Amino acid sequence: QPTVDPMKAEGRPFKGVIFFGLMLTPDGPKVLEYNARFGDPEAQVVLPRLENDIVDVFEACIDGTLDQVDLKFDNDRATVCVILASDGYPVEYKKGFPIEGLEKFKGKDDYYVFHSGTKFNENGQIVTNGGRVLGVTATGKDLKEARKKAYEATEWISFENKYMSHDIGLSLIHISEST
């Protein structure tokens, strides 16, 4: 509210999605940036759990009736997203490498692949076109299972210079196992 209320008071009411880039500090969270879009990869772990039709949610946002929508999420499952990046990202990386294995996601309910830095080349083939190439997402009964499935799914995809972090979700798993 501290962001949108002043916008409304200035005669510029906001309709849409605001993503806040935050940093946790010893003095509490601090806002680093605002974006009028979904966060990436944050949306990749939230949207698979959304039970509402996203088009209905968007229309309610546009119509100003979002407060009348009962947003429902699958809170019985966990979701993990692993970003497949081009080696060298965020500094320097090459583009244009063919991406193989995307078809392996077809028909698999707990697995998703979100495109970010991709494009079709002149032959109609999907190739790398950015530093953050794909978001490989999986759901599971808990964080440990979702993480295992997401990392397994990263092996379905290949492209030259593929890079990923191997520690996604580990700190939360360690915390949950120690409590």
What name fits each language-model region?
Residues 1-18, 35-110, 121:
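Active-site "cap" helix and flanking loop/linker of ATP-utilizing ligase/carboxylase catalytic domains
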Residues 4, 152-166:
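Short arginine-rich
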Residues 20-24, 29-38, 117-118:
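Short beta-strand elements
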Residues 81-83, 132-140:
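Short, well-ordered beta-strand elements within core beta-sheets of diverse protein domains
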Residues 92, 141-148:
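Short, conserved charged micro-motifs
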Residues 96, 147-153:
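Short amphipathic alpha-helices in soluble, non-transmembrane regions
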Residues 125-131:
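Short, flexible turn/loop "capping" segments at secondary-structure junctions
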Residues 171-179:
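Residue-level detector of conserved catalytic or cofactor/ligand-binding positions
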